[in-house]
From Swiss-Prot:
One of its GO terms (molecular function) is transferase activity. Its EC number is 2.3.1.-. It comes from Emericella nidulans (strain FGSC A4 / ATCC 38163 / CBS 112.46 / NRRL 194 / M139). InterPro entries: HotDog_dom_sf (IPR029069), THEM6_lcsJ_thioesterase (IPR051490). Disruption phenotype: Does not alter the yield of aspercryptin significantly. This is Probable thioesterase atnL. The lineage of its organism: Eukaryota, Fungi, Dikarya, Ascomycota, Pezizomycotina. Keywords: Transferase. Belongs to the lcsJ thioesterase family.
């Protein structure tokens, strides 16, 4: 049965349009779009997009309440970034390459830290008045923003991330000491956790269940500088409204006082000490420069790389 002339004309036009060059061009464009995340300059776009959102779009000179609407401290709240694993970021085993974990962490942790600490890092967001630990200093104002620097990072890989797999990066402040603020991050399977951080379906808080959804766990530490002087994290936390100024407990602004657990300095200190148990092991790596053994160990070989 012969096809109508209009259909034959259409098929002929389509066939004439499809050429090897056009097929290759289309495949190349599709490949680039599929792997856009790993292309040169995209990391910078992702980073500055987060900075723009926190420092410009969400600019505010008034710190948010100490607790959220459910009475939980904002300091320990997670910041979540949804990601994917393009083929260009895979290694020869077709798993997410080790180095690319850190580029995702850069984006996620930067926005987390800017969300928490923009009131001391950005001139436009600095409060007009700054309170100190004893509640005084109402007429004070920070003259210039602080500088924040990363002082170390580590990552443990638990499960492979396959090509094009979707996942989420969850980061929060774990603890702080006299110098460092420690941030813990988790790569988790997309859809394993609800928006409020609870497990979905039959999952619970059992550590064995956690291991099934946690793909990687990471830790980093940050220091705040005023010129060359290190600023104690507790002071920074208080200026940003993340740590109580007085001993009395406080309740969430929108929550009923009778139904919300109180959080004061004692509760924050208890959580901090618990986090320092893990963070202290990370800081224990400070001794590594003393264990080089350069004068005692031989050299297997030397080669030039890019």
């Amino acid at each position: 049965m012969a096809l109508p002339s209009s259909v034959e004309s259409l098929l002929s036009t389509v066939w004439d349009f499809i050429t090897i060059n056009r097929l290759l061009t289309g495949a190349g464009i599709y490949f680039l779009l599929l792997n856009a995340k790993g292309l040169p300059g995209v990391w910078h776009y992702r980073l500055f997009k987060g900075l723009f959102i926190e420092l410009v779009w969400k600019r505010s000179t008034t710190p948010a309440p100490l607790l959220d609407s459910q009475g939980r401290p904002r300091l320990y709240s997670y910041f979540v970034t949804e990601c994917s694993n393009p083929v260009i970021e895979c290694d020869y085993n077709l798993h997410k390459s080790n180095s690319t974990f850190f580029s995702d962490l850069d984006i996620n942790r930067t926005q987390l830290m800017m969300t928490h600490f923009k009131h001391v890092l950005s001139t436009a967001s600095m409060p007009r008045k700054t309170k100190t630990a004893n509640g005084n200093g109402d007429d004070q104002k920070r003259k210039r923003p602080l500088m924040m620097a990363m002082g170390g990072v580590s990552c443990l890989f638990h499960r492979e991330i396959k090509p094009l797999q979707r996942y989420e990066v969850w980061s929060r402040v774990l603890a702080w000491d006299e110098k460092w603020v420690y941030v813990v991050s988790y790569f988790v399977k997309k859809g394993s956790l609800s928006r409020d951080g609870n497990f979905k379906g039959d999952l619970d808080l059992d550590p064995k269940v956690n291991a099934k959804v946690v793909l990687a766990s990471c830790m980093a530490r940050y220091v705040f500088k005023e010129g060359r002087i290190t600023v104690k994290p507790e002071r920074v936390l208080q200026e940003c409204g993340l740590f109580p100024l007085a001993e009395e407990a406080v309740a969430g602004e929108k929550a009923e006082k009778a139904s919300v657990d109180s959080w004061g300095k004692e509760q924050f200190e208890e959580a901090r000490q618990k986090g320092l148990v893990t963070a202290g092991k990370f800081s224990g790596l400070e001794v590594l420069p003393l264990m080089t053994g350069f004068g005692e160990s031989g050299v297997l070989g030397r080669y030039n790389d890019f």
